[in-house]
């Protein structure tokens, strides 16, 4: 996690646990000593918070996709092991990983999923 990547395990103090991206952005914007987790799309274009550069690598779509930005987590689609997807679920998975969906996801400011 964050603490192991940054080497700050013993220095971090959990002060507040938030359950929404908007709450994290608001809390970090209001506290100059705060650090929070948020999706890149939630941070881009904001003048109140910024993504942290890690090891000289800025957080961009390109560095997320190529894996060079160290503090990231994938968004994954999951199903129950051993179960065959229903036609509707398979259609959703096919669409979510299609080039059409990728374009929509990019337009929304997020990094598209891969198959």
Segments predicted by a language model, with ranges:
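Exported/periplasmic ABC-transporter solute-binding proteins
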Residues: 1-115
């Amino acid at each position: 996690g964050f603490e192991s990547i940054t080497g700050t395990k013993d220095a971090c103090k959990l002060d507040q646990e938030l359950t929404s991206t908007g709450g994290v952005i608001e809390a970090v914007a209001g506290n100059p000593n705060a650090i929070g987790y948020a999706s890149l799309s939630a941070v881009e274009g904001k003048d109140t918070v910024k993504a942290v550069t890690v090891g000289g690598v800025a957080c961009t779509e390109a560095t997320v996709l190529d894996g060079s930005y160290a503090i990231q987590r994938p968004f994954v689609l999951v199903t129950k092991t051993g179960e065959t997807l229903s036609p509707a679920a398979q259609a959703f998975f096919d669409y979510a990983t299609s080039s059409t969906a990728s374009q929509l996801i990019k337009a929304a400011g997020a990094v598209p999923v891969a198959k």
